[in-house]
């Protein structure tokens, strides 16, 4: 089992009232409490809920349960002021049990925000099942509050030809489908069709409330032949290689607005895309696109970075950046995060970073960094200023394998070299060892403490597989997701990656490993810990895994952390999300996020 937390984190917060749509800070989702309940063992139920980013530091909670058709009864003997979860030790599991929580502030109980019902004779499993329509394989899921009720709804892709997109309310109610048309049928993972989605490292879509009206939109790259949720077909392009960014109504699937993607390399074909979201001016959500195509004969890649805003009526191009012959290496995932603490997000690739205005902030090429598959930016060293980055390399001619750097300036702090050219392929960052301060980083050459550049285990064969991490078991250390297995690193008894202590496999509950990654990882229900979503083998059910471990740690929902919420919009080669403060063993109380709630 993991280490039990030895501390309780209190979140400093204040309440405030903001004028609708006039935001001095970044507007973020006006979330509800996200109440969830799962069986924690044979006789008990774990109930979890959100602490919100702007909750008062003195807020407490009461938990209520209604059994069957009975009236709600208070479960806790005193107001709960620790972790935002509660273990119900005496439910009648033969009946349905409906839970809700009520905030308590200054001795006054406030209104409830949503309920969750655990059905009678529910299986003992750490997950919520959401039935969906039968259909083709699913690669990714995005979340956003499509209907404005304060809870996350779901948007999925279908790996069919043509590709399709489906939207569901949080309870599984089907909303709409978008058919990506004949130009999505070319699903080559390097040079896909002009409206193809989610092949290779390309996604070409994301979900967010771009106009800050309280309801999320789908942003997607489209071309001729796309059929929207209201049945209308898009045909504005002069040719099938003409592409557009489209903002689609999250409730209806109808088109709201488009902007043509300027393709300076149209003679080389349509542009493949990765999408994400950042507040590049500090207060306005921007759609950020990483766009590439390839010159003939397996030639060089053309790269365009671009950003747009959507105000509810029109789409405006904020900027474009063309790499051209500049030395600036890219990879297979993007990070959008405020590097210098000025409130404005930067756009980061594995080998360079752009400022929020689209200008080049720095390139790592002059320090020997080239293409690689994965990189991370986080508060890895709590004793150092700012944020740090860690990346790995693919076939670096100078034999560079992995590196660690100052994410604000791009200055490399340490490098590790190999004996021959090789593709490192995987790299992870997270706090998995409480005996050293800060995060660990690792690929396939051992686990290193990031800040000190020292091995935590001299035998470098004893290391976890560097795939994905998630907070799960109740302490502040990171657990591990690898190929459908939830595991943790036992720093006292290190082992090879195939023999780590394991909590469960998703197959134990009918989950399909699929592409070996989940459809989504992120904090979308309950307290601050993360959920992950997979599907069953028939692709007609979403399995949303949510922790069944109690925790004393009190943190505001990770979805109200600016860096983390940006990360939830990104796919590419799926990577773990990070907050902009140090989250790990021995952490300090994180600062209150500088946000406002839309519509508050």
Placement of each model-derived feature along the sequence:
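Intrinsically disordered, low-complexity regulatory segments in eukaryotic proteins
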Residues: 37-38
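Beta-propeller-forming repeat regions
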Residues: 25-33, 42-44, 51-56, 66-74, ...
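Bacterial N-terminal signal peptides that target proteins for export
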Residues: 1-9
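Cleavable N-terminal signal peptides
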Residues: 10-11, 22
